[in-house]
């Protein structure tokens, strides 16, 4: 067999043989086999060229995928499968990328956790969950999390929640909101409680009274359509208590109204 034509197609090359066969290859394939027009090749060489061309194409796709963003090994594997790279070739492509330090799950964890410490708001439980979803083994994740101080991240996250709800909720509900927000972000309950204890959540009575009045009016409109008398009073009390208002304040408000 003889190469009758080598035609460049963007970043790839189309090789045509005189027997009608053709193959799209990477530049690495051209260089590795020193391919040129009129070159004579036998059937075994052609099979070797095709095999390496698939490997090189897969590796090129992977490098494009990780060029601008660090990826985990599983992310790269999934990407290659999605782009119809042969599953038989993927392990060798991954090994080549690992040897070249293009993918390194331990480095991925280190960078991910460090970036969260600088600009993120996630606690260790959520970080671990997200990293494991990227296919990273827990034994690579846990030592890094254990060495990371999450108190400042939790403090910053708690303050953001406080700023958002301080004028909308009474102190008890505000405390619960901050703790739940921290738990949702993956911080431990003990750390969440400790952070909240450091915040100044006291509110003046006039502010609380204003919040209670607003909530009372809203709930009254809702429940007065279906209830009256004692039953209405009970529904209002229960709803206001669930929203974090003090029992004595609720009772006073209800007695004033009824």
UniProtKB/Swiss-Prot annotation:
GO terms for cellular component: cytoplasm. Modulates RecA activity. Its main location: cytoplasm. Pfam families: RecX_HTH1, RecX_HTH2, RecX_HTH3. This is Regulatory protein RecX. One of its GO terms (biological process) is regulation of DNA repair. It comes from the Bacteria. Transmembrane segments: none annotated. It comes from Streptococcus equi subsp. zooepidemicus (strain H70). PANTHER family: REGULATORY PROTEIN RECX FAMILY PROTEIN (PTHR33602:SF1). Keywords: Cytoplasm. Belongs to the RecX family. It is found in: Cytoplasm. InterPro entries: RecX_HTH_1st, RecX_HTH_2nd, RecX_HTH_3rd, Regulatory_RecX, WH-like_DNA-bd_sf. The lineage of its organism: Bacteria, Bacillati, Bacillota, Bacilli, Lactobacillales.
């Amino acid at each position: 067999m003889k190469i009758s034509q080598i035609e460049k197609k963007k970043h790839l090359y189309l090789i045509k043989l005189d027997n009608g066969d053709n193959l799209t290859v990477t530049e690495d394939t051209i260089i590795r086999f020193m391919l040129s027009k009129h070159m004579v090749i036998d059937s075994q060489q052609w099979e070797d060229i095709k095999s390496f061309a698939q490997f090189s194409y897969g590796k090129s796709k992977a490098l494009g995928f990780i060029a601008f963003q660090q990826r985990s090994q599983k992310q790269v594997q999934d990407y290659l499968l999605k782009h119809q790279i042969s599953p038989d070739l993927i392990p060798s492509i991954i090994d080549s990328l690992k040897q070249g330090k293009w993918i390194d799950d331990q480095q991925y964890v280190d960078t991910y956790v460090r970036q969260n410490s600088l600009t993120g708001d996630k606690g260790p439980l959520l970080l671990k969950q997200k990293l494991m979803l990227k296919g990273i083994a827990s034994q690579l994740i846990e030592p890094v999390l254990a060495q990371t101080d999450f108190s400042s991240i939790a403090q910053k996250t708690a303050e953001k929640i406080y700023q958002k709800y301080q004028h909308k909720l009474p102190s008890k509900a505000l405390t619960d909101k901050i703790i739940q927000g921290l738990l949702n972000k993956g911080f431990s309950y003990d750390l969440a409680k400790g952070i909240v204890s450091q915040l100044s959540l006291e509110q003046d009575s006039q502010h609380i009274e204003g919040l209670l009045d607003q909530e009372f009016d809203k709930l009254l409109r809702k429940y007065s359509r279906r209830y009256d008398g004692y039953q209405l009073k009970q529904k209002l009390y229960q709803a206001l208590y669930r929203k974090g208002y003090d029992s004595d304040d609720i009772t006073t408000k209800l007695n004033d109204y009824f």
